[in-house]
């Protein structure tokens, strides 16, 4: 086999003017083009001049790109954006450092003359809470500090429980094959609902809310499930109710075990775990196994 070094290859490249491939090689290449269903002709690239727009036979100068001007927020909106950024950075590891920055930022907001400043702060905090379940305890600790520091916030203290009690009655379901985008939207709402419930449980732990308020939520979930057990059309909604029951029974376990009502609650779960599916068309094996998982937590 003939071999060439690099210098020889460069020399051949510089001096080569024309070279015809053997017919057999050409045929093979053509066969490849046909198999791949691609063209073997090179399209001519038309060079475009910067000023190549023509109107009425005249060259028109291309309009210069104008960057989008982002309006800079000022006053309370700027401070609220700062608060949102600080809250988003809040994790367990930086709690001590970050909480002081958050408190200072909230003070700056409350110093501003704005009739809606308190509810605006609460809305920023609410948005944080419903989108991150992992740090619910950390968020409740910051919330407790703000409540102790600003008595006026007690007027808005029930906002989280009230909203949970509202959205728990708005559970939806859609088949992903029917509308996948809507299915994803509903899944996000389901996740946010459980995040909010986790935060409420954490608030009970640090005594922002009482256990009776949590018990009211638990009994409400049981009532919703009981009302829908006979309805096959509610089976998917019932599964989401059970997911919420599991959340409160798992994350609120130590709270429940310290209360006398634990016996009634556990008995209720036991009854669900042995329900006959044929007699309860709104119930499913998935829910049944979830109830058994809860019982394992309380052994």
Could you describe each region identified by the protein language model?
Residues 1-4, 14-21, 38, 42-299:
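Alpha-helical interaction scaffolds
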Residues 9, 26-29:
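Extracellular/lumenal mucin-like low-complexity stalks
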Residues 32-35:
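Intrinsically disordered, low-complexity segments
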């Amino acid at each position: 086999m003939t071999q060439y070094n690099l210098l020889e290859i460069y020399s051949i490249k510089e001096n080569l003017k024309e070279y015809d491939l053997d017919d057999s090689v050409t045929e093979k290449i053509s066969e490849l083009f046909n198999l791949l269903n691609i063209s073997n002709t090179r399209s001519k690239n038309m060079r475009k001049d910067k000023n190549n727009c023509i109107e009425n036979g005249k060259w028109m100068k291309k309009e210069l790109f104008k960057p989008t001007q982002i309006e800079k927020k000022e006053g309370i909106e700027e401070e609220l954006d700062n608060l949102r950024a600080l809250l988003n950075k809040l994790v367990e590891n930086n709690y001590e450092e970050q909480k002081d920055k958050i408190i200072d930022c909230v003070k700056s907001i409350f110093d501003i003359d704005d009739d809606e400043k308190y509810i605006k702060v609460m809305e920023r905090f609410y948005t944080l809470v419903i989108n991150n379940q992992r740090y619910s305890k950390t968020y409740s600790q910051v919330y407790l500090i703000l409540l102790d520091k600003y008595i006026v916030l007690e007027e808005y203290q029930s906002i989280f429980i009230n909203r949970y009690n509202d959205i728990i009655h708005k559970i939806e379901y859609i088949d992903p094959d029917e509308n996948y985008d809507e299915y994803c939207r509903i899944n996000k709402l389901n996740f946010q609902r459980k995040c909010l419930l986790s935060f409420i449980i954490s608030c009970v732990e640090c005594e922002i809310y009482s256990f009776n308020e949590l018990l009211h939520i638990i009994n409400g979930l049981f009532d919703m499930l009981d009302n829908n057990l006979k309805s096959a059309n509610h089976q998917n909604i019932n599964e989401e109710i059970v997911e919420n029951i599991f959340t409160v029974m798992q994350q609120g376990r130590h709270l429940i075990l310290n209360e006398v009502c634990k016996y009634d609650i556990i008995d209720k779960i036991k009854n669900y775990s042995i329900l006959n599916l044929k007699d309860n068309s709104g119930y499913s094996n998935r829910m049944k196994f979830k109830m058994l998982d809860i019982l394992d937590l309380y052994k």
